[in-house]
C-alpha cells in the first residue's frame, strides 16, 4: 500500500469517527484507538508534506496570527429574532402566525434550545469549508475562517453526497460547561485571565487573531439553519437540519416538532426544568414555523422574521434578605465583605452567601443589613447581589461598617486609596482597599500564603493541601513559609492524615523544594498581580533575585508585558521590610536558586537611551521625538544640560520647550539619572564603551519537548530550558533548534527528522543539562 493510499484511508476513517462522535453521539472506537490513527496520519503527512490537504483532520491546529480580521458581507442577512418573555407573548406570536397563514388546524413548529454562544456562518463550496464569518451587524461580519477550522466538530469536508455547490450553514459556536470549567482552571493555574461565563469564553476564543489560541480552546458548533444555498435541500426547517446532520454537521439533540403553541409551551417548560442538567448554557428556546412555504408567506418585518421567535428564560434571579455582612481576609490582607443571606433557591441551588467584592460595591448598591435584595447566580455559578429593593427596606436596616480590627487576628485594618499610574503621574481614584496589617501574624493571611507557596506551579511541595496547611498553622508549627524547612518528623507524625510514610514523604518533598528555578521562587512569594508568566519574565530578563529586588518601577517597565501598575506592585513588595525578612529567612533555610545568571543579552542590547527618554513623562515627546533628540545629544548629561537652542536643533519648538521644562525639575533629573544608573549597572548599555552582558547559553533558541520523560516532568524540563534562555514551543518548525524526545514521541519526532532538526533522548538531555551546571 502506498503512503498516499494509506493517508486517504486514515482520513476517511477519522472523518467517520468524528461524525459518529460529534454528530451522532455514538463513539465507534475508544479514544486511544482514535489517537493512534490520528498520530499515524500526522506522521505520514510529516513524511509526505506534499500530500497534506486543507480538509485533513490534522489541519486544525491553527496557523499564523493575523493583524486584523477582514470584513465579510452576508449575501443573505443574518437577522435577529423577536423575543417572548412571558407565555402571553408566545401566544400572541402564535395568534399572529395563524392569522398570517389563514389556515385551519395547528401550525407545525420546530423547537430548539437557544445556545448562549456566538452566531457564525460557514460557507461550503463543493463540499469544502472555504469561509467562516461572525454575524456582525447582520449584514457584514468578520472573516474568522482560520479559527472555525480549529473547532473540532465543524467538518472541513462534508460527508456523503448530494450537497449543493454552494451551501451556507448557520449556527452557534459555544463552550460546554465542562469545557469552560477546564479552560478557567487552566487559565487560573497559569496565572492568566479567567472568563466570567461560557459565552464570553467562546466569543473571546473565536475572535482571537492567533488561531493557535482558538485551537487550544474547547469550542463546539451547533447548526440551526442555512443562509445562501445554490439549490433546495428541503421543504421544512427540521428536514433541512436532518439533511445537514447527514452531511456531517452537528445539530441540537433537543430538536423537536410541536403542533401548535401549546406544545411549544410544553417544550419550553420541559427544557426549563432540565436547563441546569444540560451540558451547555442556554438562555431560552427558539420556535420556528416548520414549513418553508409558510415561512415565505409570513415574510419579515423590519429586521426580524415573522415566522420565528426566541422565548427567553427569566434571569436567574430571586429576592432574599441580607441577614448580615461578614468580612473575609485574603492572602494579601485584603478585607472583603460577604453577604450572609436568608437561604433562597436560585436556579435550583440554595444560596446563602453572595460576594460583595469591596466597600465600593456596597456603596454603589446602597446596601444595608436587613435589606431585601435581588440575587443572581452570574453565569449560573457565582451568586451576586444585583440590586437593593428600596421600597422593602425595614426601619431598622443598619449601614455596613468595615471593622477597625481584623476579624481573624485582631490587627488594625487600614484603608488605602487606590492609585492609578501613567508614566510619572499618579492619580488617586475614588476607590479604596481595606487591609489587615497583621501580615503573617494573621492566621488567614498565613494560611493562604503557605497554600500558594506550596502549590504545584510554585514550590510544588506534594502532600500539603489546604487542610494540611491549616492543621500545621493551627498547631503552631509554622508561622512563615521558612518554618516549613524547620519541620521535624516528630512534630508532624501523628497529625491527622500523617502516618510515618506520609510524614517522611512530606519532609522529602520539602527538602527537594530547596532547589527551585528563580521563576518558581518569585511566583511562590505571592507578589500581587505577578502570575506564573510574569515571574518567568522577571527571571528570564533580569537573571537574578538581587536584580529583581533592586529594580526601580520604571526599569521594570522595560520588561515584556510589565506595565507601570504591576511594576509598582513588584517594587513595593521588595521594598517592604516584612517581605525582605521573609525572603531572607527562606534564603537562610538553604534555598539554592538554580538558574541565576547574567541579564538576558537580547534584553540588554535592545535598551537604548532614546527608549529611556520616551518612557519619561515628557509632554509630546514619544519614541520618534526621543530618537531625534538622542541623535543630536547622545548622552543624558548633554540632554539635561542643553539650552533651548540645542534642543530646538533636534526637536520642534513645542517639544524642545517640554524637554527643557521637564529637566528644570531636580526631581525629574534625579529620576532620570537613577534609571540610567540602574540600567547601566544591570548591564544594559547605550555607550559603545559599555560591554554587553553575556547571554544565556540557549538565548534565541527554540526547543520542543515530546513524548514521556521518565526522570522529570515536562513542566520541570521546560523550566530548566527556559532558565538557560530557551523558548519552549509546542510544535516543530524550521526554526526549532533541538527536540527532546522521550518514549512515545510521535509526529513531532517525525517532523524533526524530516526537517533535520537535532534530537536528544532523555539521557543525552540530562547530560546536556549537567554540562550547563543544572542537576536533575
Swiss-Prot record:
What does the record give as the active site? 114 (n6-amp-lysine intermediate)
Task: Extract the Pfam families matched here.
Answer: BRCT, DNA_ligase_aden, DNA_ligase_OB, HHH_2, Nlig-Ia
Similarity remark? Belongs to the NAD-dependent DNA ligase family. LigA subfamily.
* Catalytic reaction(s) noted: NAD(+) + (deoxyribonucleotide)n-3'-hydroxyl + 5'-phospho-(deoxyribonucleotide)m = (deoxyribonucleotide)n+m + AMP + beta-nicotinamide D-nucleotide
The protein's organism comes out as Pseudomonas putida (strain ATCC 47054 / DSM 6125 / CFBP 8728 / NCIMB 11950 / KT2440)
Q: Which residues cross the membrane?
A: none
Question: Which Enzyme Commission number(s) are listed?
Answer: 6.5.1.2
Positions of NAD(+) binding: 31-35, 80-81, 112, 135, 172, 288, 312
Instruction: Give the HAMAP family listed for this entry.
Output: DNA_ligase_A
Q: Which residues form a coiled coil?
A: none
Protein known as: DNA ligase
| GO biological process entries | DNA repair; DNA replication
The molecular function terms of the Gene Ontology recorded here are: DNA binding; DNA ligase (NAD+) activity; metal ion binding
Where the record annotates domain BRCT, the positions are: 693-776
Q: Where does Zn(2+) bind?
A: 406, 409, 436, 442
Recorded GO cellular component terms are: cytosol
Function comment? DNA ligase that catalyzes the formation of phosphodiester linkages between 5'-phosphoryl and 3'-hydroxyl groups in double-stranded DNA using NAD as a coenzyme and as the energy source for the reaction. It is essential for DNA replication and repair of damaged DNA.
Matches recorded under SMART domains:
BRCT, HhH1, LIGANc
Q: Which domain of life is it from?
A: Bacteria
Q: Which cofactor does it need?
A: Mg(2+); Mn(2+)
Alphabetized, the UniProt keywords read:
DNA damage, DNA repair, DNA replication, Ligase, Magnesium, Manganese, Metal-binding, NAD, Zinc
The coding gene here is ligA
Keyword Zinc-finger present in the record's keywords: the answer is no
Amino acid at each position: 500500500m502506498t503512503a498516499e493510499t494509506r493517508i486517504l484511508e486514515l482520513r476517511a476513517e477519522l472523518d467517520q469517527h468524528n461524525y459518529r462522535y460529534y454528530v451522532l453521539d455514538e463513539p465507534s472506537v475508544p479514544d486511544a484507538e482514535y489517537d493512534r490513527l490520528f498520530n499515524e496520519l500526522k506522521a505520514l503527512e510529516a513524511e509526505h508534506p506534499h500530500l497534506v490537504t486543507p480538509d485533513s483532520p490534522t489541519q486544525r491546529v491553527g496557523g499564523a496570527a493575523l493583524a486584523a480580521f477582514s470584513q465579510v458581507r452576508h449575501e443573505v442577512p443574518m437577522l435577529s429574532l423577536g423575543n417572548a418573555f412571558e407565555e402571553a407573548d408566545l401566544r400572541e406570536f402564535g395568534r399572529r402566525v395563524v392569522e398570517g397563514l389563514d389556515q385551519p388546524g395547528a401550525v407545525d413548529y420546530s423547537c430548539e434550545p437557544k445556545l448562549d454562544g456566538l452566531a457564525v456562518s460557514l460557507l461550503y463550496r463543493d463540499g469544502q469549508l472555504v469561509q467562516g464569518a461572525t454575524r456582525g451587524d447582520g449584514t457584514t461580519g468578520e472573516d474568522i475562517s482560520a479559527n472555525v477550522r480549529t473547532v473540532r466538530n465543524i467538518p472541513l469536508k462534508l460527508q456523503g453526497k448530494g450537497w449543493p455547490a454552494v451551501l451556507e450553514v448557520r449556527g452557534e459556536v459555544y463552550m460546554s460547561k465542562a469545557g469552560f470549567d477546564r479552560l478557567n482552571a487552566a487559565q487560573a493555574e497559569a496565572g492568566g485571565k479567567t472568563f466570567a461565563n461560557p459565552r464570553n469564553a467562546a466569543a473571546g476564543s473565536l475572535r482571537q487573531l492567533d488561531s493557535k489560541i482558538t485551537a487550544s480552546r474547547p469550542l463546539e458548533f451547533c447548526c440551526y439553519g442555512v443562509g445562501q444555498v445554490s439549490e433546495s435541500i428541503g421543504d421544512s426547517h427540521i428536514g433541512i437540519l436532518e439533511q445537514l446532520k447527514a452531511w456531517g454537521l452537528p445539530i441540537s439533540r433537543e430538536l423537536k416538532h410541536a403542533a401548535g403553541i401549546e406544545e411549544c409551551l410544553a417544550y419550553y417548560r420541559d427544557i426549563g426544568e432540565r436547563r441546569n442538567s444540560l451540558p451547555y448554557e442556554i438562555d431560552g428556546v427558539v420556535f420556528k414555523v416548520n414549513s418553508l412555504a409558510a415561512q415565505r408567506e409570513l415574510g419579515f418585518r423590519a429586521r426580524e422574521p415573522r415566522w420565528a421567535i426566541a422565548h427567553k428564560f427569566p434571569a436567574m434571579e430571586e429576592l432574599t434578605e441580607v441577614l448580615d455582612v461578614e468580612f473575609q481576609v485574603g492572602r494579601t490582607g485584603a478585607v472583603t465583605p460577604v453577604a450572609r443571606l436568608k437561604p433562597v433557591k436560585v436556579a435550583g441551588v440554595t444560596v446563602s452567601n453572595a460576594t460583595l467584592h469591596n466597600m465600593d460595591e456596597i456603596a454603589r448598591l446602597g446596601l444595608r443589613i436587613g435589606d431585601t435584595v435581588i440575587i443572581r447566580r452570574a453565569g449560573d455559578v457565582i451568586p451576586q447581589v444585583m440590586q437593593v429593593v428600596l421600597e422593602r427596606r425595614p426601619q431598622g436596616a443598619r449601614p455596613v461598617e468595615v471593622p477597625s480590627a481584623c476579624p481573624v487576628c485582631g490587627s488594625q485594618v487600614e484603608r488605602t486609596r487606590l492609585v492609578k499610574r501613567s508614566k510619572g503621574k499618579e492619580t488617586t481614584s475614588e476607590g479604596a482597599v481595606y487591609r489587615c496589617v497583621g501580615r503573617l501574624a494573621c492566621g488567614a493571611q498565613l494560611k493562604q500564603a503557605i497554600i500558594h507557596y506550596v502549590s504545584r506551579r510554585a514550590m510544588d511541595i506534594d502532600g500539603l493541601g489546604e487542610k494540611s496547611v491549616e492543621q500545621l498553622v493551627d498547631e503552631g508549627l509554622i508561622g512563615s513559609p521558612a518554618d516549613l524547612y524547620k519541620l521535624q518528623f516528630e512534630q508532624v507524625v501523628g497529625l491527622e492524615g500523617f502516618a510515618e510514610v506520609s510524614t517522611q514523604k512530606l519532609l522529602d518533598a520539602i527538602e527537594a523544594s530547596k532547589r527551585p528555578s528563580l521563576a518558581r521562587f518569585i511566583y511562590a512569594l505571592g507578589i500581587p498581580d505577578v502570575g506564573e508568566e510574569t515571574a518567568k519574565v522577571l527571571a528570564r530578563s533580569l537573571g537574578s533575585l538581587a536584580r529583581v529586588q533592586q529594580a526601580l518601577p520604571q526599569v521594570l517597565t522595560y520588561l515584556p508585558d510589565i506595565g507601570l501598575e504591576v511594576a509598582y506592585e513588584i517594587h513595593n513588595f521588595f521594598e517592604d521590610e516584612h517581605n525582605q525578612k521573609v525572603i531572607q529567612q527562606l534564603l537562610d533555610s538553604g534555598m539554592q536558586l538554580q538558574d541565576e545568571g547574567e541579564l538576558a543579552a537580547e534584553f540588554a542590547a535592545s535598551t537604548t537611551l532614546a527608549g529611556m527618554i520616551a518612557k519619561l513623562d515628557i509632554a509630546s515627546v514619544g519614541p520618534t521625538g526621543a530618537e531625534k533628540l538622542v541623535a543630536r545629544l547622545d548622552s543624558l548629561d548633554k540632554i539635561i544640560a542643553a539650552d533651548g537652542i540645542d534642543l530646538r536643533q533636534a526637536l520642534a519648538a513645542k517639544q524642545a520647550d517640554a524637554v527643557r521644562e521637564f529637566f528644570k525639575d531636580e526631581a525629574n533629573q534625579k529620576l532620570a539619572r537613577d534609571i540610567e544608573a540602574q540600567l547601566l549597572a544591570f548591564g544594559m548599555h547605550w555607550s559603545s564603551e559599555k560591554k554587553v552582558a553575556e547571554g544565556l547559553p540557549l538565548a534565541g533558541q527554540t526547543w520542543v519537548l515530546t513524548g514521556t520523560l521518565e526522570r522529570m516532568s515536562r513542566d520541570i524540563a521546560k523550566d530548566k530550558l527556559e532558565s538557560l534562555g530557551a523558548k519552549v514551543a509546542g510544535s516543530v518548525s524550521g526554526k526549532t533548534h533541538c527536540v527532546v524526545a522521550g518514549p512515545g514521541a510521535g509526529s513531532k519526532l517525525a517532523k524533526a527528522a524530516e526537517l533535520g532538526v537535532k534530537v536528544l533522548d532523555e539521557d543525552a538531555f540530562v547530560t546536556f543539562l549537567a554540562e550547563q551546571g543544572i542537576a536533575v
